[in-house]
Regions:
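Juxtamembrane regions of bacterial inner-membrane/periplasmic proteins
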Residues: 2-303
Length: 303
């Protein structure tokens, strides 16, 4: 009798439908997801706050540099006597300089600028001094200790590194480089940045074995003519040297030309620059084909 009552009670209990079961599971999963998302969000906020404070602590060096001091440091070209760096029209100073190794827009063939921006910083005229994506890629390769070239530094960053900071590979130096690069973009025009960079950057060695810096010195030393007369092939070759000047230079320490197989390394780099110029539509297919046929070794200066 008792057993029969229990069965009757069970039969009269409301049955849970599939929909109700699904709703119960859904609510539980929803609470778990909200809890997980809340914890994740709080963790990210904490990490962001820590990162901001850490970044501020390691960029104090850049905060102590005034705008005027930073501008003068960025523009300073060692060994120049006739440049008035306080002149707000610094490109005019470069154009009118009595020193043939200091050049401005009127003294530099536009192919050099095209080669430089196409191969080293294709977004130069659009960014504000840094490229977040390239920077993250560089950091990732640094963390995983890979040797592949990242292209993480813009021309502005390279100017800051050469003129204001050192070449040491520390996170402090890199952080200050980022801050100063963004400030540099507010103090100088794009043309002031790129022509100053071309006037100070190292290009390896000349045919006497001496170290050379600046596009004018490189143009005279390698091809025996001013940068205003450099053709597309020569422009690509000179700019190709910038990634690793003493590796790609065609000259040995005594100024003698390297063996053909070593000179070819620099020519291969030149072909890369030409391809980048074609991809970025800085040159036509015909100009690319003609430049690839140009005999660089035949035109190099020798003793």
């Amino acid at each position: 009798m008792t057993h029969q009552k229990v069965e009757n009670n069970l039969q009269h209990q409301p049955q849970i439908s599939k929909y109700e079961k699904f709703e119960i599971i859904y609510k539980k999963l929803k609470h778990i997801f909200i809890g997980f998302f809340t914890i994740l969000t709080c963790t990210l906020i904490i990490l962001l706050v820590i990162t901001v404070f850490y970044f501020q602590s390691i960029t104090k060096e850049s905060e102590h540099i005034s705008d005027n001091t930073l501008r003068l440091k960025l523009l300073n070209i060692p060994g120049t006597q006739d440049i008035n760096y306080s002149n707000q029209h610094i490109l005019s100073e470069y154009n009118q300089s009595l020193n043939p190794l200091i050049v401005g827009p009127k003294n530099v063939n536009k192919n050099i600028i095209k080669a430089l921006t196409a191969s080293e910083d294709s977004l130069f005229y659009r960014h504000n001094g840094i490229l977040p994506k390239a920077l993250l890629r560089a950091v990732g390769q640094d963390l995983f200790n890979t040797d592949a070239a990242t292209g993480g530094s813009t021309i502005t960053q390279q100017l800051v590194k050469n003129q204001v900071l050192t070449n040491e590979k520390t996170y402090d130096r890199k952080a200050n480089e980022l801050v100063l690069s963004m400030r540099a973009e507010t103090l100088l025009t794009k043309d002031e940045i790129i022509y100053t960079y071309l006037n100070i950057v190292p290009f390896g060695r000349d045919y006497n074995g001496a170290n050379i810096s600046g596009i004018s010195s490189a143009s005279y030393s390698l091809f025996g003519k001013p940068p205003s007369e450099i053709n597309i092939a020569e422009s690509a070759y000179l700019i190709g040297l910038l990634q690793s000047p003493y590796y790609y230079t065609p000259y040995q320490e005594d100024g003698v030309l390297k063996p053909d197989d070593q000179i070819q390394i620099g020519i291969n780099r030149q072909h890369y620059v030409l391809k980048r110029m074609l991809v970025e539509k800085k040159i036509t297919q015909h100009e690319f084909n003609q430049s690839e046929k140009f005999d660089i070794k035949k035109h190099l200066m020798t003793k």
